[in-house]
């Protein structure tokens, strides 16, 4: 009460001063109020410099409009929009009692909205949007009974919408989106009979959508997306006959979709996606004759697709994907003549694809992938002239691909992989030279690759592995400068690999394994400066290994095994500093093993068995401290002693030296190789005692007459070398569900080769060519948006960020700068402006490989994955448009000294991130791997829900002298020891990196620390457990650890983290198993039986 009286006194004193001043100057009272208002502003651009106290009236001042009364004009309008003003809004605004319009939008004003605004009783339009106002909406706003437009979006306003809003009976527009408004929606909103637009998205509004909303009888636009609204959708929404737009996506609505919504006969857009809606799709939706956009994806909808949906004669886009819909695709969908987009992927649909869909002449994007569809592909698809993207992968489709597919349509993306298709590849797929991604892998296709494909100038990815294709390597293919991936493995190709392969200058992946290629490997392959993976294994190639191949300095994976290569291995192999895997096994290579192999510090696997190598094992191999998966030198003709330097390979899991002519003793220091899971020294000429190795088996030492000690005959006076008895607990003692899952994972995983990464496109894409300044279409700009976002322009982004002003920067990274942009339509985006390295020349066109990557990323949708809304290229600026995450990154919050994340939030983040990764690994088809999991790439929304971000981004950032860089290896501290360039290794690398993030959440430590503080967090945790056992001392001291249940739960999650960071990728669980273990750990709340700590640390430590 005292504070209120003091504020009142200050107001009256200010009023008295103004009156006193007005007595000594000629300026009228409202002019004095305006000068007081100006005094609280910071006018950086001096836009208000003509506000002069010497004037008698303020009517000529910038932004001021008065009535026409000549004697004593009244201020009716104050419009200071976009004047670059900062500071605060003075309470003196309440003195402008005749004001009808107040527009302070697009400035930098802060502070609270003064309650004195309620004195402006004539106010009709109040626009305060795009500022930094905070605090609550003053309840006095309810006194503005003449108010028609209340526009306050894109501020920092908090609190709830006041009940007094219901007093604004003249209100037509209530626009409050992109603030921090919380609480429930007031039921008094039902009083607003004249309200036409209610937009309050991107806030934190909770509770239900009140049934009183049915009283807003004039409502046209209802936008409450991205809040925390829950409960069922009220059936009263059906009372809103004028409703045109219902935008309620990304909330927590549950229950059924009310059939009463079909009474909204003016409805044009219904966006209910990313909620928790269940039950069938109401057949009554078919009565919405004006409906154009229907988005119900990512809910829990079940049942069949109503045939009545076919009555939506004006529909343009329908997306029912990512639900649990069953039954057949209704043939009535073929009645929607204007349909451009139909997405039904990731459901449980059965039956055949209706031939009626081929009558949809305007169809441009069709995705029916990840279902259980059978039968043939309708022949009529080949006549759809507007077809841009066709994805039917992961079904059970059979028959042939329509032979004239591509003749009439301008195909950009075609993915029919993982089906049972047979016959030949159509010749016309790239007839119009726009094909970017062609994936027909894992089918039963036969015949040759058509010339029309091998000469396709726009082609970026050609994926035809695992078919029955024949013929020779298409030499024409390498005349196309954009090709980055050629996958022809597991077919029946014959003949030589042509010299023209050296012309594929952008090639990053060349996979030709398991064919019948013969002849020598062409030396021209050394011209492929961007090549990261070369797999020519299991062919019939002969001749020497050309030294030119070692000019491919970007090589990370080189697999030449199972051929007939001969001669020596050139020493230039030691110059491949990026190499992580080298497989040369089962050839006829001879000579000595090059000592230069010791330079390959990133090597994780070295396979050279089954050759004719002679001489000694180079001691330089002991420098390969990153070697982790295997060192295989078996079945050669090696002589001399085993160099003790190999004991430096502390991460090594498999050491195979059998079937050589090695002599001397097995170095006793091999007992320190605690990571060894398997080894074989058999059939050599070794002597002396066997070191204290783990998992000792007699078969690993037989064929060496001079060896002794367990498991062979005892050595004379070798008691010190006798191994200690195992104290491990029987497996039957561990009955925890988590451990059962873990055992199933470890026991069930086998080493296998997995196909290289294929790109997935499943989200709606709208491509709009921007206009040049003269109004003519420009070929130098490209905007790609992923609906249902509205089609904004590059100019909108410039305006929203004040031409990318520093004040809008919210982050910086190696890839570029991130800006916060609030667009006129109400969307808040994180705009990543990529660092450009094009120098000189006209290089504004977006290359096809870049577009393909962008489209791939934009097509991924999951609640725990940051959404890429689009890409914009304009006059040399490359912009990525992301979903905005207001809480920033996990790394920033977690490693801030003031971090107050409790365990419940941390576990929620851990589980959310795991679910996002599991979606990429297991539910996308083909599977997608992140490659750079770290705490800074896990972003948090207002509810601390985890969103995995930046996956795949490094592949689309232009690097100097290259069209697209090779896949990155991750970030320091998160990189799995065995990381290589294939899907198999990358998948396990993701899991390792995720395990590091778990350890960060548990310990609070950064992934890498100074050596004196324990070095990397993985080794620090392992060392701590070995020294002090599994106890709460390893956990973040900032957490409250008095609750034994919480500590027990955290230690259970710690075990999961240790499994994820196992040295052996074979021992790591899959992401799907990680999610199951985390869920089970929460259910049990730490009550599970525990793993034996000693065994756990032994099986996971290097």
From Swiss-Prot:
Residues in compartment: Extracellular: 27-737
Stored InterPro entries: Kinase-like_dom_sf, Leu-rich_rpt, Leu-rich_rpt_typical-subtyp, LRR_dom_sf, LRR_N_plant-typ, LRR_R13L4/SHOC2-like, Plant_RL_S/T_kinase, Prot_kinase_dom
Molecular function via GO: ATP binding; protein serine kinase activity; protein serine/threonine kinase activity
Pfam families xref list: LRR_1, LRR_14, LRR_8, LRRNT_2, Pkinase
Each LRR repeat, start to end: 72-96, 97-120, 122-144, 145-170, 172-192, 193-216, 217-241, 243-264, 265-288, 289-312, 314-336, 337-360, 361-383, 385-408, 409-432, 433-456, 458-480, 481-504, 505-528, 529-552, 554-576, 577-602, 604-624, 625-649, 651-672, 674-700
Top enzyme class: transferase
Localization annotation: Cell membrane
Protein name: Probable leucine-rich repeat receptor-like protein kinase At5g63930
Species: Arabidopsis thaliana (Mouse-ear cress)
């Amino acid at each position: 009460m005292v504070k209120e009286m003091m504020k009142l006194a200050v107001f009256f004193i200010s009023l008295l001063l103004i009156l006193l001043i007005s007595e000594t100057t000629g300026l009228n009272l409202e002019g004095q109020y305006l000068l007081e208002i100006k005094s609280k502003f910071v006018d950086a651009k001096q836009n208000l410099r003509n506000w002069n106290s010497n004037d008698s009236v303020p009517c000529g001042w910038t932004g001021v409009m008065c009535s026409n009364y000549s004697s004593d004009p009244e201020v009716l309008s104050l419009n200071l929009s976009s004047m670059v003003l900062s500071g605060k809004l003075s309470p003196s605004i309440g003195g402008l009692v005749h004001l009808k319009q107040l527009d302070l939008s697009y400035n930098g004003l802060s502070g609270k909205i003064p309650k004195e605004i309620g004195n402006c009783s004539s106010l009709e339009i109040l626009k305060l949007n795009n500022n930094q106002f905070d605090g609550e909406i003053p309840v006095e706003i309810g006194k503005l009974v003449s108010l028609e437009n209340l526009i306050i979006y894109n501020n920092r306003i908090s609190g709830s919408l006041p009940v007094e809003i219901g007093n604004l009976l003249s209100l037509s527009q209530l626009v409050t989106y992109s603030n921090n408004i919380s609480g429930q929606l007031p039921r008094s909103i039902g009083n607003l009979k004249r309200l036409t637009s209610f937009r309050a998205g991107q806030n934190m509004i909770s509770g239900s959508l009140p049934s009183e909303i049915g009283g807003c009888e004039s409502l046209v636009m209802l936008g409450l997306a991205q809040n925390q609204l829950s409960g069922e959708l009220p059936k009263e929404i059906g009372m809103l006959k004028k409703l045109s737009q219902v935008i309620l996506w990304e909330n927590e609505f549950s229950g059924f979709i009310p059939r009463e919504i079909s009474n909204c006969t003016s409805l044009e857009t219904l966006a209910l996606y990313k909620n928790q809606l269940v039950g069938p799709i109401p057949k009554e939706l078919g009565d919405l004759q004006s409906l154009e956009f229907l988005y119900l994806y990512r809910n829990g909808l079940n049942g069949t697709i109503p045939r009545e949906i076919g009555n939506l004669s004006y529909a343009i886009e329908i997306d029912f994907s990512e639900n649990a819909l069953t039954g057949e695709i209704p043939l009535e969908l073929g009645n929607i003549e204007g349909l451009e987009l139909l997405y039904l992927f990731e459901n449980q649909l059965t039956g055949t694809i209706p031939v009626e869909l081929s009558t949809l002449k305007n169809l441009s994007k069709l995705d029916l992938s990840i279902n259980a569809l059978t039968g043939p592909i309708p022949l009529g698809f080949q006549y759809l002239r507007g077809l841009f993207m066709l994805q039917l992968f992961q079904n059970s489709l059979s028959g042939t691909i329509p032979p004239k597919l591509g003749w009439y349509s301008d195909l950009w993306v075609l993915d029919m992989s993982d089906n049972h298709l047979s016959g030949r590849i159509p010749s016309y797929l790239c007839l119009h030279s726009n094909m970017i991604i062609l994936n027909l892998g894992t089918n039963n296709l036969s015949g040759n690759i058509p010339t029309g494909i091998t000469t396709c100038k726009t082609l970026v990815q050609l994926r035809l592995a695992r078919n029955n294709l024949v013929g020779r390597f298409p030499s024409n293919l390498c005349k196309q400068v954009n090709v980055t991936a050629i996958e022809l493995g597991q077919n029946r190709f014959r003949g030589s690999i042509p010299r023209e392969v050296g012309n594929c200058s952008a090639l990053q992946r060349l996979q030709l394994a398991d064919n019948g290629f013969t002849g020598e490997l062409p030396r021209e392959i050394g011209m492929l400066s961007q090549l990261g993976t070369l797999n020519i294994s299991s062919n019939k190639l002969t001749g020497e290994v050309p030294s030119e191949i070692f000019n491919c300095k970007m090589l990370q994976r080189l697999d030449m095994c199972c051929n007939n290569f001969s001669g020596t291995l050139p020493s230039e192999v030691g110059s491949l500093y990026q190499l992580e895997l080298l497989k040369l096994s089962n050839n006829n290579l001879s000579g000595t093993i090059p000592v230069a192999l010791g330079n390959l510090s990133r090597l994780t696997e070295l396979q050279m068995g089954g050759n004719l190598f002679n001489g000694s094992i180079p001691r330089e191999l002991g420098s390969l401290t990153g070697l982790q998966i295997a060192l295989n030198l078996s079945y050669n003709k090696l002589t001399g002693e085993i160099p003790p330097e190999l004991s430096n390979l502390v991460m090594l899991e498999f050491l195979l030296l059998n079937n050589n002519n090695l002599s001397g003793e097995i170095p006793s220091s091999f007992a320190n190789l605690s990571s060894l899971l398997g080894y074989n020294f058999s059939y050599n000429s070794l002597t002396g005692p066997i070191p204290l190795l783990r998992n000792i088996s007699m078969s690993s030492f037989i064929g060496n007459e001079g060896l002794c000690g367990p498991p062979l005959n005892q050595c004379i006076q070798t008691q010190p070398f006798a191994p200690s008895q195992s104290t491990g607990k029987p497996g039957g003692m561990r009955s925890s569900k988590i451990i059962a899952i873990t055992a199933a994972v470890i026991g069930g995983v086998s080493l296998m080769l997995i196909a290289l990464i294929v790109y997935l496109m499943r989200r709606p894409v709208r491509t709009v060519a921007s206009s040049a300044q003269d109004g003519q279409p420009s070929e130098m700009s490209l905007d790609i948006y992923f609906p249902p976002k509205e089609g904004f322009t590059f100019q909108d982004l410039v305006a929203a960020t004040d031409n990318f002003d520093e004040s809008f920067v919210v982050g910086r990274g190696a890839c570029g700068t991130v800006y916060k942009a609030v667009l006129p339509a109400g969307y808040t985006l994180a705009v990543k402006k990529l660092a450009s390295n094009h120098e000189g020349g006209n290089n504004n066109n977006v290359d096809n490989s870049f577009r393909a990557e962008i489209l791939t990323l934009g097509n991924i949708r999951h609640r725990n994955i940051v959404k890429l809304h689009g890409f914009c290229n304009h006059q040399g600026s490359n912009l990525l448009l992301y979903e905005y995450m207001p809480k920033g990154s996990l790394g920033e919050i977690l490693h801030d000294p003031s971090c107050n994340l409790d365990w419940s939030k941390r576990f929620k983040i851990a589980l959310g991130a795991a679910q996002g990764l599991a979606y990429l690994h297991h539910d996308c088809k083909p599977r997608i791997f992140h490659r750079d999991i770290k705490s800074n790439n896990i972003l948090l929304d207002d509810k601390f829900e985890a969103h995995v971000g930046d996956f795949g981004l490094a592949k689309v950032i232009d690097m100097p002298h290259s069209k697209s860089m090779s896949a990155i290896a991750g970030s320091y501290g998160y990189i799995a020891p065995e990381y290589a360039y294939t899907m198999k290794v990358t998948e396990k690398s993701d899991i390792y990196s995720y395990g590091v993030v778990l350890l960060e959440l548990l310990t609070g430590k950064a992934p890498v620390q100074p050596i004196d503080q324990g070095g990397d967090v993985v080794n620090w945790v392992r060392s701590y457990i070995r020294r002090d056992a599994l106890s709460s001392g390893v956990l973040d001291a900032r957490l409250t650890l008095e609750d034994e249940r919480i500590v027990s739960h955290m230690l259970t999650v710690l075990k999961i983290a240790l499994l994820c960071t196992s040295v052996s990728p074979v021992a790591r669980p899959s992401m799907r198993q990680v999610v199951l273990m985390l869920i089970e750990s929460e259910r049990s709340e730490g009550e599970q039986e525990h793993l034996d700590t000693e065994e756990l640390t032994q099986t996971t430590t290097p």
